[in-house]
Amino acid sequence: MTSGTSRGGLAILAWLQLVRLPGVITAAADSLSGYVLLNPGWQLHDWDRLIPLAAVSMILYAAGMALNDVADHAVDQAERPGRPIPSGRVRRSHAALFAAIGLVVGPGILYWNREIASVIAMALAACVVAYNLWLKHTSLGPLAMGTCRGLNFFMGLAYSPLCGVELPLAFGLFVVGITMISRSEVAGGSIREIVPGLIVEMAALASLGALALMPGSRPADWDPRHFQAILGISILAAVAIAQLAVGWRAIRSPEPKTIQKLVKTGVLSLVWIHVGLITAVLGPPAALPFVALWVVAFLIARRLYAT
């Protein structure tokens, strides 16, 4: 009994590592943030939309991570032999089946509910496939990954007639920067991707801060002098400072460990970007659930890798 329980626990752990569980949680924050930002009067009865929305984001992210490791099987055998598929803890065929089911079921949940966001979910699923199977190792790889996360954010925004593409574009740009940096996290030894990646991230954060202060992004009675605006922009500034601090260490010592730390910080910072935006537009109380999401993702990331 003990041996069987132990094997079962190790199998579950392998699957949680495969899907990058901390990142799955940050994916839920993307779409939920989009919904909350443009629906400031949301109430508990909106859970019939919020729960499927979060579920779709998490399913598509998990499916994408599984497909990532299926596609990179040969590379991981040489560079990351301890990962679930090359180590034999998860069968490649099982991971491929899981990815295929997730990429169909995810958009299907919103389509079943006749939500307009289902069209965006389908586009996101297609983008996930294109990134993992064709674009990842090309010059378009970072742009494709940024598009995936931008679409995930846009999926929540689409529930409002006020939605625009500016916020998801700027958010996706930040992910482009993370992805640029991640390309050197295995080999290390070069700052060729780190510096441009950090510059892209800073440009994205500046754009997000500016968009949060624009008239179209806030309720009619919002005033830029309000405390919530200062606090929200300060949170975005803190994200920038944290990235630059970790980035400086990676520049000084461009080893795999320091670069992986920079990438991990960037991934977990995605939730804080949402916290900053929601705080600036709607106030701190509306952002508290997203702080809780970050705490959960951070605690899990101490045990499971997020990149």
Predicted regions mapped to residue ranges:
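Short capping loops/turns at secondary-structure boundaries
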Residues: W112, V119, L133-A144, E166-F174
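Membrane-embedded alpha-helical segments of multi-pass transporters/permeases
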Residues: S31, Y35, P107-Y111, L133, ...
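Multi-pass membrane catalytic core of lipid/isoprenoid biosynthesis enzymes
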Residues: P52-S57, H73-V128, G146, G150-G156, ...
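C-terminal membrane-associated helical module and adjoining short loops/tails
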Residues: T2-L16, G150-T307
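Hydrophobic faces of alpha-helical transmembrane segments in multi-pass integral membrane proteins
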Residues: A29, S33, A55, I59, ...
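Topogenic membrane-insertion module of multi-pass membrane proteins
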Residues: M1-G82, R89-F98, A117-A126, N132, ...
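Flexible domain-boundary/linker segments
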Residues: A29-V36, G41, D76, R80, ...
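Helix-loop junctions at the membrane-solvent interface of multi-pass transporters
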Residues: V36-L37, W112-N113, L133-W134, A158-Y159, ...
